[in-house]
Design a protein with these regions (language model features):
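Flexible glycine/proline-rich, aromatic-decorated loop/lid segments
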Residues: 190-194, 232-246, 254-281, 290-315, ...
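Phosphate/diphosphate-binding loops
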Residues: 58-61, 76, 81-84, 96-98, ...
């Protein structure tokens, strides 16, 4: 499953169909920054960012173009989206409806993990309590209507990218997972039902053996917590199902071809650690969005591991190794100690609001960078075996004509739709937001009426307010 999206829905659709032809087993959608933080492509705040790091999606028209000629009942789609996850899921559902596909057949994932946004990434909009409401509304709606959908991907990836250690990535991710499970239970959901649809997202970093042990420790920890803390009895609700992406922060702008080797080693650690799905970064992603060539090479890397290495023939092939077992137990113990410390603070939301989690990550990031600067940690091509004469790589460029076309398209949607119906549906959404009703049906109604992502986000901005880090 290769993470991809850029410039426009049309061009991203072409990349998805290319990847499907090359053998990917599912799609993984990258959205641009305005989409992630609830702005339409024609908004002043979106200027300079449209299509830059992912695909811009403002309306149902964009979503239909993104999945043109892709059978949504046959392909699993992962969407890396958080603050606006409810709206993107609604757009996907309405796209399926327009293709005459039953939403009960839809398979995929929304990342929907807002806590790690406050910790590490920053694409939050609303305060934590209101964000948790949107998350649990997705849990409840999908449990009833989209049963094959994974409603959250509890993410350590970005926590590691922000500079955490392996143990901190594990602890902060599992702690956030505890908060989500408790919120779902408080909403009246049954742990043995929604627990089966939870998934995780981890980082595969440079230290090969530590990463294998980290994945094994995650599986142990989650099973123990679901069984002992939340009294789950269904084995499937105790499984730590996880996706892995190779570490983007480990890619270097210098000697970019070296990144192929880094990514291969990281991908192998994820497979040996038991990952259910995998994204291998393209070697040029330290500099730009991947080209067709680099994206294909990244895909071939994991296909060679899957089909030629032989490691996928065995469950937990590193189990029993004295080194791996000790590393696994040490990471499990260290992570549990951190989780208990967070529990004593009142849980992850309290720990986030005081800034404790962010400060712990910052300290680890500083220590790691110091070790590179002092050359204690060797990075080939950066502080060791430096080559000043390397050629410039060929990079993917953003097509500004496509960006202008995207902006014009959003303006055309707003001009040509039934704006009386749009206004009515947005007012109904605002009324729902003031109540305790599940917001998903009202969001879906807005999408059917061609309300845009930014307009829906603005309703919630007005009702919920915006979060500001202190």
């Amino acid at each position: 499953r290769q993470y991809s999206g850029f410039t426009s829905a049309k061009e991203s659709n072409e990349r998805y169909r290319y990847l499907l032809d090359q053998g990917v087993s599912g799609l993984s959608v990258a959205f641009d920054l305005p989409t992630q933080i609830g702005y339409d492509s024609d908004h002043l705040m979106a200027e300079g960012e449209v299509g830059k790091v992912g695909v811009p999606i403002s309306s149902i028209n964009d979503m239909e173009r993104l999945f043109d000629d892709i059978p949504l009942d046959q392909v699993s789609t992962s969407m890396t989206i958080n603050a606006t996850a409810a709206t993107l899921l609604a757009l996907y559902i309405v796209t399926a409806e327009r293709k005459n596909i039953s939403i009960e057949k839809l398979r995929g994932t929304v990342q929907n993990d807002i806590l790690k946004e406050y910790i590490a990434r920053g694409t939050y909009i609303y305060p934590p309590e209101e964000s948790m409401r949107l998350i649990t509304d997705i849990f409840a709606f999908c449990s009833d209507h989209v049963p094959k959908w994974n409603t959250i991907s509890i993410s350590g990836y970005h926590i590691r990218e922000a500079g955490s250690t392996a143990a901190q990535e594990l602890a902060f991710t599992i702690s956030n997972g505890i908060a989500y499970v408790q919120a779902a239970i408080d909403k009246g959901l049954k742990v043995d039902v929604f627990g089966k649809q939870l998934s995780f997202f981890f980082n595969a970093h440079n230290d090969f053996l530590t990463e294998i042990a980290k994945f094994r420790a995650a599986r142990r920890l989650w099973a123990i917590i679901m069984k002992n803390r939340f009294k789950a009895t269904n084995d499937k609700a105790m499984i730590c199902r996880f996706h892995t992406q190779t570490g983007g922060s480990t890619l270097t702008a210098q000697q970019v071809d070296n990144n192929i080797t880094r990514t291969t080693i990281q991908a192998l650690s994820a497979v040996l650690g038991g990952t259910q799905s995998l994204h291998t970064n393209a070697f040029d992603e330290a500099l730009a969005l991947p080209t067709d060539h680099s994206a294909k090479l990244a895909l071939r890397t994991q296909q060679i591991i899957a089909h030629e290495s032989g490691v996928t023939q065995f469950t937990d092939p590193m189990g029993g190794s004295e080194v791996i077992e000790k590393l696994t137990s040490d990471l499990e113990d260290e992570a549990m100690s951190i989780i208990e410390k967070i529990d004593a603070m009142g849980g992850p939301i309290s720990a986030i609001e005081t800034g404790w989690v962010q400060n712990e990550i910052a300290k680890s990031a500083y220590a790691y960078q110091k070790s590179i600067d002092s050359e204690k940690t060797k990075i080939v091509g950066v502080n060791a075996y430096v080559d000043d004469g390397e050629p410039e790589p060929v990079l993917q460029e953003i097509d500004q004509a496509s960006v202008r076309k995207q902006i014009e398209g959003v303006k055309a949607v707003k001009k040509n739709r039934d704006n009386h119906t749009v206004k009515t549906k947005l007012l109904q959404l605002e009324t729902h937001a003031k109540s305790e009703k599940n917001l998903m049906p009202a969001i879906i109604d807005c999408v059917r009426a061609e309300c845009t992502l930014g307009e829906i986000a603005d309703v919630f901005r007005k009702q919920f307010g915006e979060f500001r880090q202190t």
